[in-house]
Regions:
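Helix-loop-strand module that forms the ligand-binding subsite of alpha/beta enzymes
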Residues: 30-37, 42-55
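Short glycine-/small-residue-rich Rossmann-like dinucleotide-binding loops
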Residues: 18-19, 45-46, 67
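Short secondary-structure junction motifs
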Residues: 22, 36, 117-119
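Glycine/Thr-rich phosphate-binding loops of Rossmann-like dinucleotide-binding domains
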Residues: 23, 50-52, 72
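Generic beta-sheet signal
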Residues: 42-44, 59, 64-65, 72
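A structured beta-alpha segment of the ubiquitous adenosine-cofactor-binding alpha/beta core
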Residues: 1-34
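Structural scaffold positions in well-ordered secondary structure
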Residues: 14, 32, 41, 60, ...
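Acidic, glycine-rich segments within the central catalytic cores of soluble metabolic enzymes
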Residues: 65-162
């Protein structure tokens, strides 16, 4: 009841439960849109609100690996056999939040122009895939092009970027 009262005055709802959880509570977009036609509702999940991986749990390190991001990074840091980095910065979380921000701002602009809100489906996986398009294309070529001109150089006490 409290959440529904909060939503009654909200312009935006952002949720990041596994797909289907909000529907169980009657708090999904389809349950709210008739009473709140201007609502901008953003669902964030690991692999999206539909599709073959919809019920897979995800957090940043899982999505780093599933998207190929870890593999691309390992290859650039010493070869495909290198152990993927143990990221201390959860790139997927940051990038997905930034992607959601842009989508929400666009939906708010659309609402100003057309008078209706919308449901936004943001997946961590899709957000991460935006980081590696050149690597994906290169993997499909017989001879993969060199991507980027700047690489860390190994020195006696670590690496330096030139």
């Amino acid at each position: 009841a409290l959440v529904k009262r909060l939503i009654a005055d909200a312009d935006i709802v952002i949720e990041n439960f596994r797909p289907g959880i909000m529907a169980r509570f009657g708090l999904d977009y389809d349950s709210l849109k008739d009473s709140r036609p201007g609502l901008v509702y953003c669902s964030i999940s690991g692999f999206g609100q539909s599709g073959p991986y919809v019920h897979r749990a995800a957090y940043a390190p899982i999505v780093h690996a599933a998207s190929g991001f870890d593999s691309v990074h390992a290859a650039s840091q010493g070869g495909a056999d290198s152990r993927p980095a143990n990221w201390e910065i959860m790139v997927a979380d940051i990038l997905t939040g930034t992607t959601a921000f842009g989508a929400i701002q666009t939906a708010l602009l659309g609402r100003e122009r057309h008078g209706v809100g919308e449901h936004i489906d943001i997946s961590m996986m899709e957000s991460m895939m935006t980081l590696i398009p050149a690597h994906i294309q290169g993997a499909q070529m017989e001879e993969s092009p060199v991507i980027g001109r700047f690489h860390p150089v190994k020195v006696k006490d670590g690496f330096v970027m030139l």
